[in-house]
């Protein structure tokens, strides 16, 4: 069975680069009816935090990237790592090394001074040193000294490294803790991982890991090293570019569907198709069409996709996110129009759910603030009389007539005729009175969504506060 994994370290938050790796791994497993597993690589006890673990899990949950088994934690597997280390030592594939820090520092200085390749020189490789109580020692892996380490990378093609370029790496530190390159191999063997999809910053680790797989007589998985994501300026993606906790995108009003759609196309293609549902991603995704070159993060493209999903999604698919932002903004959705009706009207005017909430607040909150510039421009000495006439005309409408935007628009137009002024002399002041600003959807739709009670009370307030009468 095809089995992939995502293995973040909880030393920082989950950012878009990690999310894309997780997405590619998840999609490949789903495409092949396989399994997707999640492993938390938390062996760096000094830098790993529970807050970072929680952020990773929150991000994966928000995006809908569900793992198929219980989460693996490396800190719960130390006994297993030590078991395998003892096995390698017993088989002559690893050895104890008691070289002092001073000796290793001198070795490195000598190598650098003579333009030699830096690395351990194998002094303890064939020695018969056995640690005694109180000794300071490490355990090193006996890397092959001849030949090549080669693999057919699913993204980068054939890669070969001479074993002469690799030294005998440490697999257990002086404090007894196992090292990263060793742990991940044991984990991937035990988890039966068949395909490792990860960032290409791991390419240099791969030959070391392949040699450990072979030493353990284990099947070597397929590797797919995905190029990094660059900022819009071509520099390494940083916080100023968008390399922030993925949950910040939620706070900024992006939909998970938009994030996933954007990231799947960031370095992977399927013809000219830009819009992908989750099901379409699963059906189409493969490793062959991952681009071997880095991709640049494009905020405008992400906003365009987010706008698309706000406009085109079934409301039930985005309801949770919309309600989240309204609650965060302190708006009571029971005190206004149905959210589905609101989104249908406002979607064309916004790129994010934060914008949607901010631009829609007057529908749900009576605490509107008048835009001074709009008031100064559109509210005149005769506006009070117009507002009074509007009140009369709106009060005369039956309840069901408030459900028809055209009827409400016609009331505004007929009021303009009655007052012998142009439509703009009525519509703009009315818009300011009921929304606080000179911008809103079509006046008939705005009136319908607000409803009779709100419109009348806000007109009465405007007469008192804006018209001094």
From Swiss-Prot:
It comes from the Bacteria. Keywords: Aminoacyl-tRNA synthetase, ATP-binding, Cytoplasm, Ligase, Metal-binding, Nucleotide-binding, Protein biosynthesis, Zinc. One of its GO terms (cellular component) is cytosol. SUPFAM superfamilies: An anticodon-binding domain of class I aminoacyl-tRNA synthetases (SSF48163), Nucleotidylyl transferase (SSF52374). A motif ('HIGH' region) lies at residues 8-18. GO terms for biological process: glutamyl-tRNA aminoacylation. GO terms for molecular function: ATP binding; glutamate-tRNA ligase activity; tRNA binding; zinc ion binding. Zn(2+) binds at residues 97, 99, 124, 126. CDD domains: GluRS_core (cd00808). InterPro entries: aa-tRNA-synth_I_cd-bd, aa-tRNA-synth_I_codon-bd_sub2, aa-tRNA-synth_I_CS, aa_tRNA-synth_I_cd-bd_sf, Glu-tRNA-ligase_bac/mito, Glu/Gln-tRNA-synth, Glu/Gln-tRNA-synth_Ib_cat-dom, GluQ/Sye. Binds 1 zinc ion per subunit. Its EC number is 6.1.1.17. A motif ('KMSKS' region) lies at residues 236-240. Monomer. This is Glutamate--tRNA ligase. It comes from Francisella philomiragia subsp. philomiragia (strain ATCC 25017 / CCUG 19701 / FSC 153 / O#319-036). The gene is gltX.
């Amino acid at each position: 069975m095809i089995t992939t994994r995502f293995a973040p370290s909880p030393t920082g938050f989950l950012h878009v680069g990690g999310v894309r790796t997780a997405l590619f791994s998840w999609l490949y497993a789903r495409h092949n009816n396989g399994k997707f597993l999640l492993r938390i690589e938390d062996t760096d006890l000094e830098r790993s935090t529970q807050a970072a673990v929680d952020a990773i899990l929150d991000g994966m949950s928000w995006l809908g990237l569900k793992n198929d088994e219980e989460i693996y934690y490396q800190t719960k597997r130390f006994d297993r790592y030590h078991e395998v280390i003892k096995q390698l030592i017993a088989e002559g594939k690893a050895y104890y090394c008691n070289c002092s820090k001073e000796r290793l520092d001198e070795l490195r200085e000598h190598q650098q001074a003579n333009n030699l390749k830096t690395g351990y020189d194998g002094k303890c490789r064939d020695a018969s040193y056995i640690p005694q109580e109180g000794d300071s020692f490490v355990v090193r892996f006996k890397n092959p000294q001849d030949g090549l380490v080669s693999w057919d990378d699913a993204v980068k093609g054939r890669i070969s490294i001479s074993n002469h370029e690799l030294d005998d790496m440490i697999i257990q530190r002086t404090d007894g803790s196992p090292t990263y390159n060793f742990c991940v191999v044991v984990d991937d063997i035990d988890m039966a991982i068949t395909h490792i999809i990860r960032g290409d910053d791991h390419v240099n680790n791969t030959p070391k890991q392949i040699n450990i797989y072979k030493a353990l007589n284990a099947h070597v998985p397929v590797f797919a090293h995905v190029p990094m994501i660059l900022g819009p300026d071509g520099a390494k993606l940083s916080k100023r570019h968008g390399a922030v906790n993925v949950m910040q995108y939620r706070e900024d009003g992006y939909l998970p569907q938009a994030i996933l759609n954007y990231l799947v196309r960031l370095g992977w293609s399927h013809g000219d198709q830009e819009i992908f549902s989750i099901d379409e991603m699963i059906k189409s995704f493969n490793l062959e069409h991952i681009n071997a070159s880095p991709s640049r993060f494009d905020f405008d493209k992400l906003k365009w996709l987010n706008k698309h999903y706000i406009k085109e999604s079934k409301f039930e698919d985005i309801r949770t996110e919309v309600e989240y932002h309204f609650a965060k903004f302190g708006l009571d959705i029971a005190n206004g129009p149905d959210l589905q009706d609101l989104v249908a009207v406002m979607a064309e005017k916004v790129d994010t759910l934060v914008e949607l909430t901010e631009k829609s607040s007057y529908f749900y909150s009576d605490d509107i603030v008048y835009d001074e510039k709009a008031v100064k421009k559109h509210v005149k000495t005769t506006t009070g009389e117009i507002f009074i006439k509007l009140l009369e005309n709106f009060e005369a409408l039956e309840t069901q007539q408030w459900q028809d935007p055209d009827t409400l628009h016609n009331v505004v137009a007929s009021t303009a005729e009655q007052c012998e002024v142009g439509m703009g002399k009525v519509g703009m002041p009315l818009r300011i009175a009921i929304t606080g600003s000179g911008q809103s959807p079509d006046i008939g739709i705005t009136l319908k969504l607000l409803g009779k009670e709100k419109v009348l009370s806000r007109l009465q307030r405007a007469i008192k506060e804006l018209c001094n009468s």
